[in-house]
Amino acid sequence: MPYIYMNITLAFVISLIGTLMYRSHLMSSLLCLEGMLLSLFTLNALLSLNMNFTLSTMVPLILLVFAACEAAVGLALLVMISNTYGLDYVQNLNLLQC
């Protein structure tokens, strides 16, 4: 396994561990989730370039679109929670239910 793939996989695992460890604050969870998506995008782009298959070049772009949508929804939730409660705890998400 080349070192670049091992480094990208290690970045994904570190972001996953960060998501599992620091899930009390919404901002840290969103940052770790973005790190996971960035490493997935990089790995996907490298693999699609190495495969030389023209249809596989669309997959990283689709993943990037989903990452942008996830970031927008996450930031909207963060702004709504911080304006309502003044804190960004994940526990406050349970208070948003009707």
Swiss-Prot record:
Disulphides: none
Q: What sections of the protein cross the membrane?
A: 1-21, 29-49, 61-81
Where mainly located? mitochondrion
Question: Listed GO cellular component terms?
Answer: mitochondrial inner membrane; respiratory chain complex I
What is the protein's membrane topology class? Multi-pass membrane protein
Q: Which reaction does it catalyse?
A: a ubiquinone + NADH + 5 H(+)(in) = a ubiquinol + NAD(+) + 4 H(+)(out)
Q: Which GO terms describe its biological process?
A: ATP synthesis coupled electron transport
For this protein, the record's InterPro entries field holds: NADH_UbQ_OxRdtase_chain4L/K (IPR001133), NUOK/Mnh_C1-like (IPR039428)
Identify its protein family: Belongs to the complex I subunit 4L family.
Q: How does it assemble?
A: Core subunit of respiratory chain NADH dehydrogenase (Complex I) which is composed of 45 different subunits.
This one is known as: NADH-ubiquinone oxidoreductase chain 4L
